Amino acid sequence: MKTVTEFQNKNILVLGIAKSGYAAATLLQKLGANVIVNDGKPLAENVLAAELQAKGMDVVCGGHPLELLERNISLVVKNPGIPYSNPILVAAKEKQIPIVTEVELAYRISEAPFVGITGSNGKTTTTMLTFEMLKEGQKHPVIAGNIGTVACEVAQDAKENEVVVTELSSFQLMGVELFQPKIAAFLNLFEAHLDYHGTKKEYGLAKANIFKNXTENDYSVINADDADVMALSAYSKGQKVLFSTTKEIEDGACIKDNALYFKGEKVVEVGDIVLPGQHNLENILAAMSIAKLLGVSNEAITAVLKRFTGVKHRLEYVTTINNRKFYNDSKATNMLATEKALSAFTQPTVLLAGGLDRGNEFDDLIPYFKNVKAIVTFGQTAPKLVRAAEKAGLDTIESVDTLDEAVVKAYAHSTDGDVILLSPACASWDQFKTFEERGDIFIQAVHKLI
């Protein structure tokens, strides 16, 4: 365990509780900091805040008063979801108070090396694949970040011979100062989270923070097929390891002769991979690159790929009813994810889509509707998806209020041999707390049809 003294007797403001804020506050108190916790939700409605107050922390709820910054604050640890435009963060920046996220805190207290994985899509699948490959290769991985345990809950206990594998969002990466993963993987980039970042350029620069502190002793795993990612990799001083599904990469990972290769050596036959979807080959190449850089054998990688069928809510097979296959892709919170999901199937498909309106149209989906026989829309974006479906010339287009209704309608529009696919192309927050809740409700609704 790493001994950490830098926070002792320092006044540290934890802004926004939720799971990561709760873990950060608890850790900082353990490390001897004077922790002030602030959350916008009233204390009476905030179970986690009440628990932290019971631990003796100074808890302020119901808003973000600027007066908190007058308490000789040394550091602000913010919830990733709170935008930097929030007045208290603007004021903290003006006062030159460092602002970090929980992942930065985790890195500072750990003696274990980190693997960081970011991108617009495929992060969770790649992170899970990496974890499984490292585990199979006896490299003692610990999974943390957006999936698994909150990073700062496990980081201090992680030993030098272990590896902390983290899935990282742009929100988390905006708040890094010293964070220096031994291996940083950047999977892809497309326009997303513009309500938070403003422009695709700013979004990409936030992601590129994963390279911020890399040195020549570190590695950057880069998607050579993504021009934006390649351009942003210029920010890395680490050794670049490229992967591609479209061209041969001599000093990286690629597909050749129906097999996956790393630095010229065949690792696994494509036919041995059970994870469906062409897009998942990108995720596999990235995970394989990380595993090989950390010394995992081809045999261990192959063993994982022969059994790894995917991650819950990511093109997850649910069941078959009357020869109709149901798939839960609730994690598809943007168009690119839905494009890749639709590309994974050649069968006639009934698509369920819709959710939070972030201001974009859905015309980019039109070329991917070639196998879509019907669409059932729901949520705030239903009218926009209907417009895109009409432009695509779909004959069967229907809008409903709830996901339960959408499942019933989708089944009614299906016939023998069809795929019924939930791939919303939108975030879930208009009707659900999380994409996981949305996926679980979809699965429950499907089982009601039996």
UniProtKB/Swiss-Prot annotation:
Organism superkingdom: Bacteria
| GO function term, MF aspect, one | UDP-N-acetylmuramoylalanine-D-glutamate ligase activity
Catalytic activity entry: UDP-N-acetyl-alpha-D-muramoyl-L-alanine + D-glutamate + ATP = UDP-N-acetyl-alpha-D-muramoyl-L-alanyl-D-glutamate + ADP + phosphate + H(+)
Q: Where along this sequence does the record place binding of ATP?
A: G119, S120, N121, G122, K123, T124, T125
The subcellular location is: Cytoplasm
Among HAMAP family, the record links this protein to: MurD
Primary role: Cell wall formation. Catalyzes the addition of glutamate to the nucleotide precursor UDP-N-acetylmuramoyl-L-alanine (UMA).
Q: What is this protein called?
A: UDP-N-acetylmuramoylalanine--D-glutamate ligase
Give the organism, scientific name: Bacillus cereus (strain ATCC 10987 / NRS 248)
